Structures are given as C-alpha cells and as structure tokens.
From Swiss-Prot:
It comes from the Bacteria. Coiled coil: none annotated. This is Large ribosomal subunit protein bL21. Disulfide bonds: none annotated. Part of the 50S ribosomal subunit. Contacts protein L20. This protein binds to 23S rRNA in the presence of protein L20. PROSITE patterns: RIBOSOMAL_L21 (PS01169). Keywords: Ribonucleoprotein, Ribosomal protein, RNA-binding, rRNA-binding. The gene is rplU. One of its GO terms (biological process) is translation.
Length: 103
C-alpha cells in the first residue's frame, strides 16, 4: 500500500514504515502529525485518486528529527571587473516516519 500526499508545496510518494524528508514543520520531535492533503491511495489493484484530494484520506506520521540540508553556494561574478560575491544557504527540513495510511 502506498499513497501520494503534498506538504510544503511538494508531492511525496510514501508507504507505511518509510522515513521521508519534508520542508520544515513547526512540530516538536516525537509528536504525531496527520496529513489530510492526500492525492492518491493505492492498495494492490484498488486505486483511489482524489479530485483534488481523496475524501477521508489521512496519512499519520511521527516527527523523527529536524535539521539543515547541505550548503548551496550562490556566486555572482563579473569577468574583468574585479567583482565577485558569494553567498551560502542551508534549508531547514523535518524527517517524519509514516505510521499509517487510511482512506
């Protein structure tokens, strides 16, 4: 059984017991979270597709950890003008473990 849901403007395909990295959620580590924006649920041959969301579809998860991703460097450069700017960015994320999928 697997499902597709959206969180943080992105869509994720998950199955029960899987750990997923999402955009930062303001929920403490160890707490439970439910995602109601379920786009699709598949259970063997049976597939439910939402318009836009599956009615009654809920994905339950537990927050495992918070952290920051790898550093991305942004560089602005003008040749022959002695001009160079560098900037770095690290995006916050939340790891969640999927505990249940229900329709």
């Amino acid at each position: 059984m697997y499902a597709v849901f959206q969180s943080g403007g992105k869509q994720h395909r998950v199955s029960e017991g899987q750990t997923v990295r999402l955009e930062k959620l303001d929920i403490a580590t160890g707490e439970a979270v439910e995602f109601a924006e379920v786009l699709m649920i598949a259970n063997g041959e049976e597939i439910k597709i939402g318009v836009p969301f599956v009615e009654g579809g809920v994905i339950k998860a537990e927050v495992v950890a918070h952290g920051r991703g790898e550093k991305v460097k942004i560089v602005k450069f003008r040749r022959r003008k002695h001009y160079r700017k560098q900037q770095g960015h690290r995006q916050w994320f939340t790891d969640v473990k999927i505990t249940g999928i229900s329709a």
